[in-house]
Amino acid sequence: YGRNKRSIVLNLKDPEELEKLKALVSQSDVLVENFVPGKMEEMGLGVDVLQSLNPRLVIARVSGWGQTGPYAHKPGFGTLVEAMSGFAHLNGFPDREPALPPLAMADMYAGIYGAFGVLAALRNVEHGDGKGQVVDVALFESLYSTLASEAVKFQATGTANRRMGNQAINTAPRNIYACADGKFLALSASVQSMFENLAQAIGRPELIDDRRFLTNEDRVIHCQELNKILAD
């Protein structure tokens, strides 16, 4: 992700190199940092210092848990966030342990949210009051925001969704099926017209009028039976 970008390495414990960073800050639009909250202030690089050098500076602060709150002082890491957000609890198969994503998911979401926040802050600099802003980006909040519907359900019912593997809790069919040639097919047909087209495509038009599969709600209830038919 750093292709075609110029880079510089500075030892911020060295007073002379710290001054070089301040010189860069004075002529930059954005500064992005991901130290544990409070570390920048310890080095004499708090928001007040940075924006006194450049009042138009936008500062993006990326951390595990945010700049405020009971976990703010704790180190953050994507794996911790992917577990504590509830994502791992929902990911995987019902008869197995929770599953972490095979990529840096929390970091990626935080990067996207951070970029949007920085763009909005730059817009304010250019067309608003001309002052820089601080964008507080927490890995936890970025990933947790994608689970909003899960939080609403838990608040309303006191129950959490269970792991469903490749299936969805509220639509069917949705799964990955093994094919005769050893390859796999990802399939989702929750909309009624899509299911009817699927039934025709696999040569099973009678499924359309099968009482077990008349509606999406029916198909969710009988998803195991439907999965077996599709797998065969």
Where are these regions (language model features)?
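Short, cationic motifs built from Arg/Lys/His that form the positively charged side of catalytic pockets
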Residues: 5, 36, 54-56, 100, ...
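Aromatic-enriched alpha-helical interface/lid elements that frame and gate functional surfaces
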Residues: 173-232
